[in-house]
């Protein structure tokens, strides 16, 4: 069981995974531990993950998120971002202070199910956004 810092974050994630067996069956996509540590660990395996995903899925952008998607696998991305300030902005309506960004929270994991191939455009467009249930369903069902 995950211990979300805020109950409303758990409430936010529940409907995203409803069609995928529920939140509990998808805990492997989430890791609430320190984002910097997760990023350092990912950087050590990034190239290997990229090769394995290309071998398994081919040279395809699994996100198809940007209107001008090139549909080529150029990068590895996290489906659920390692960290994001989206919920702090939208749910808690936090504002940035004097040139500082709204604080980010740690969410995504380095589990293989959370890795996707993407083109540069889609990866750049998605940034730290948490995908909606339609994109989650498409990618996790490997229907791209």
Predicted segments, located by residue:
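Short, charged surface segments at domain edges that flank catalytic/cofactor-binding sites
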Residues: 13-65, 96-109, 113
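C-terminal/domain-terminus segments
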Residues: 2-13, 127-144
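Compositionally biased, intrinsically disordered low-complexity segments
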Residues: 7, 14-16, 48, 52, ...
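Cys/His-rich metal-chelating microdomains
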Residues: 60, 64-72, 121-125
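Hydrophobic/aromatic-lined pockets within catalytic cores
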Residues: 54, 80, 84, 123-127
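Intrinsically disordered, low-complexity peptide-like regions
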Residues: 1-7, 76, 121
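Hydrophobic beta-strand residues in large extracellular and virion-surface proteins
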Residues: 49, 61, 76, 115-117, ...
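Histidine-centered nuclease catalytic patch
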Residues: 66-117, 130
